[in-house]
Design a protein with these regions (language model features):
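Conserved phosphate-donor/acceptor-positioning beta-strand/loop module used by diverse small-molecule
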Residues: 193, 197-200, 226-246
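Conserved lysine of the Walker
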Residues: 125
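P-loop (Walker A) phosphate-binding loop of NTP-binding proteins
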Residues: 120
Length: 301
């Protein structure tokens, strides 16, 4: 923008921001009359306008470069055609309007992507998701869709033989539970949030412990055809011995079998296979690129 002589000023000490720091953000103040030229200059540098409800005097711009998220918060200066009102009643009304706008859908098309991170225990799902939460400088929601075991049951569980009817009922219960959890995630995605799923019900396609054929068939239908498929799927991958060394759950042979099942089931369906044995930063960077691609497609940039 300097080359185009666009007038702007840094805010909140942003001229000293380290752009290479995770989750960094640059705040500027800009005259509304300069906005058109500024947006054209930012587009040339790979930035995209991120429509965010409830912020009428702010324009957000997002870019992704070599595994890093870059964000510019451009606040429109008062005046120059921007109508403002003062006083406590107007301020309260503005806050209420902002809160309502942040909960409404951005449009007729869902703007926020739903990205699922899958993999056996010890693959690094929690580590990757926490890093993405810290580094992605836009609205982000995390939904846990795994089974919560009671404390003290980290070892292998003995599966009792149950009737086919009871097993089918359990599959139905799990489907209803996951649908209710996914509803919260998709509501956030409709408001523009990036939604990260820590596990996902579609894992049942790879790891099916059903003992009866009727329950296995029902699970394939409910979880494979009627469960909403994420916009992007990342399969975190590591050898069984490495997975066992990280969490000491199951056995190396069981974990290796699960690893192969994840690879064979989801990679042919378009999932991104991300190795977590080449360093955590490399895995985070690759997962970030997957999320960016999903956001880019949902926003139609």
């Amino acid at each position: 923008m300097d080359h185009r002589r666009i007038r702007y000023a840094f805010r909140k000490g942003s001229e000293q921001v380290n752009l290479y720091a995770p989750g960094s953000e640059v705040d500027i103040l800009i005259d509304p009359l300069e906005l058109h030229d500024a947006e054209r200059a930012l587009r040339e540098q790979g930035f995209h306008w991120l429509d965010a409800p409830g912020c009428p005097r702010h324009r957000f711009y997002l870019a992704f470069d070599r595994g890093r998220w870059l964000k510019i918060d451009a606040k429109l200066a008062r005046g120059s055609g921007v109508t403002t009102r003062s006083g406590r009643p107007w301020k309260a009304a503005e806050q209420l309007a902002t809160a309502l706008a942040q909960r409404r859908p951005l449009g007729l098309r869902r703007a926020g992507p739903v990205v699922a991170l899958l993999g056996p225990d010890g693959a690094g799902k929690g580590t990757i998701i926490e890093a993405l939460r810290e580094r992605i400088p836009v609205g982000l929601s995390v939904v846990y869709l795994g089974e919560r075991r009671p404390r003290g049951t980290s070892g292998p569980r003995v599966r009792a033989r149950v009737s086919a009817l009871r097993e089918c009922a359990f599959v139905m219960y799990r489907a209803l539970r996951f649908w209710s959890l996914l509803l919260r995630g998709y509501l956030a995605a409709w408001s523009g949030h990036i939604v990260l799923c820590d596990r996902h019900p579609i894992e049942a396609l790879a790891i099916r412990p059903r003992t009866s054929r009727s329950a296995a068939w029902l699970e394939r239908v409910l979880f494979g055809r009627l469960m909403p498929w994420p916009d992007a799927v990342a399969v975190l991958d590591a050898p069984g011995e490495v997975l066992y060394a990280r969490k000491r759950e199951h056995s190396p042979n069981v974990l290796e079998h699960q690893r192969q099942r994840y690879r064979d089931t989801f990679v042919p369906r378009g999932a991104r296979l991300i190795s977590t044995t080449n360093g955590v930063e490399a895995a985070i960077s690759e997962a970030s690129a997957l999320v960016w691609t999903a956001l880019h497609e949902r926003r139609r940039w």
